[in-house]
């Protein structure tokens, strides 16, 4: 029997999942602004993003549209978020300008 890796290759012990109001728009924002690599995007029957994986540097993060019927709400819907993410990049000024201009 094959052994299953406890932490999948390319992942870390903690992998954030972002719940957003418009998954497709958010994915394009992260791709255009931060240069993330889109690893996969799976849609539900209604067209919402059910699961997406994005990679920036050596880190993977996941993203999905909000699913209120499963109590998954975006920060926009609930009026904020108790969670923050720190993103480390080589040239912060360049990335800031790119993100600012891609809004």
Residues of each region from the PLM?
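Conserved beta-strand-loop-alpha-helix junction that forms the acyl-donor binding cleft
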Residues: 21-22
